[in-house]
């Protein structure tokens, strides 16, 4: 039976959720089939850390605002969180900033994974450089099949305990919400209007990549959210749809 993998990354396979009745999904999230890269190629990428250990990814929206996934911030206090920015390695280099506050989307549902997006406010502002840059939010979705990239420090095989020290990325192609929900793939009605998908043969995000960026055309189009396994041929990776959720991110960033 397929496991529903919610791309969280903090752990190997903690249970958490979405649909088929009686099937509890795993918290998961990794770059499968990817390549090592450096932060200068993905300067908006951050490592969200719980008690000093990599937990999820995220994206720099402004000097003190990070965008990540709501499922990354369940049952956790801001005081236990920090962000490492500007480093190719999650465990060293760059700068570390404490988390002052965060807000999950009020409509987030752990059973359906709708509205899986959150905003973090840092206790101190990041200084922008070649290795730390903000990324703009998509205003519309790229066309089905458009080139995209996803990055992170998640595990490199499904169910693995270990994560790479160096940032990884993989090139994928956008699968539109309507296409992802169609009979061409296996999700059906589980794909909702706050989701967008991406896929490539043998490539995907997985444990540890949750909350991280899906980028196409130089803008943030998705936030790593969930999927059935990692890199399963009939099940693309599923992401929070940034274009659809953009107004919430902007208003929350201005008020948190």
Curated annotation (Swiss-Prot):
GO biological process, one term: proteolysis
SMART domains hit by this protein: Tryp_SPc
Disulfide bonds: 56-72, 180-197, 206-230
Propiece residues: 23-30
Reactions catalysed according to its record: Preferential cleavage: Arg-|-Xaa, Lys-|-Xaa
Top enzyme class: hydrolase
Active site (record annotation): 71 (charge relay system), 116 (charge relay system), 210 (charge relay system)
This protein's UniProt keywords: Disulfide bond, Hydrolase, Protease, Secreted, Serine protease, Signal, Zymogen
Site annotation Required for specificity: residues: 204
The Peptidase S1 domain, residue ranges: 31-254
Compartment(s) of residence: Secreted, Extracellular space
EC assignment: 3.4.21.4
Cellular component aspect of the GO annotation: extracellular region
Molecular function as annotated in GO: serine-type endopeptidase activity
Source taxon at top rank: Eukaryota
Leader sequence residues: 1-22
Primary localization class, coarse: secreted
Family in the record: Belongs to the peptidase S1 family.
Protein's name in the database: Trypsin alpha
Lineage: Eukaryota, Metazoa, Ecdysozoa, Arthropoda, Hexapoda
Designated gene of the protein: alphaTry
């Amino acid at each position: 039976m397929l496991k529903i993998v919610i791309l969280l990354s903090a752990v190997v396979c903690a249970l958490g959720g979405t649909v088929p009745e009686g099937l509890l999904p795993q918290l998961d999230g990794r770059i499968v089939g990817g390549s090592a890269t450096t932060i200068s190629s993905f300067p908006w990428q951050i490592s969200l850390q719980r008690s000093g250990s990599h937990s999820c990814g995220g994206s720099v929206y402004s000097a003190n605002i990070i965008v990540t996934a709501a499922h990354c911030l369940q049952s956790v206090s801001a005081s236990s969180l920090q962000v490492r920015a500007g480093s190719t390695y999650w465990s060293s280099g760059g700068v570390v900033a404490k988390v002052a506050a965060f807000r999950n989307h009020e409509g987030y549902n752990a059973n359906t994974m709708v509205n899986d997006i959150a905003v973090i406010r840092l206790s101190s502002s990041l200084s922008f450089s070649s290795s730390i840059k903000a990324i703009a939010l998509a205003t519309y979705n790229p066309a089905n099949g458009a080139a995209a990239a996803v990055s992170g420090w998640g595990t490199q095989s499904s169910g693995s305990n270990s994560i790479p020290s160096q940032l990884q990325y993989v090139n994928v192609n956008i699968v539109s919400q309507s296409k992802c929900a169609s009979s061409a793939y296996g999700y059906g009605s589980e794909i909702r209007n706050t989701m967008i998908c991406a896929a490539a043969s043998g490539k995907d995000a997985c444990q540890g990549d949750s909350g991280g960026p899906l980028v196409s055309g130089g803008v943030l189009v998705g936030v790593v959210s969930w999927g059935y396994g990692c890199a399963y041929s009939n099940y693309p990776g599923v992401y929070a749809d940034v274009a659809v959720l953009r107004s919430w991110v902007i208003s929350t960033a201005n008020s948190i």
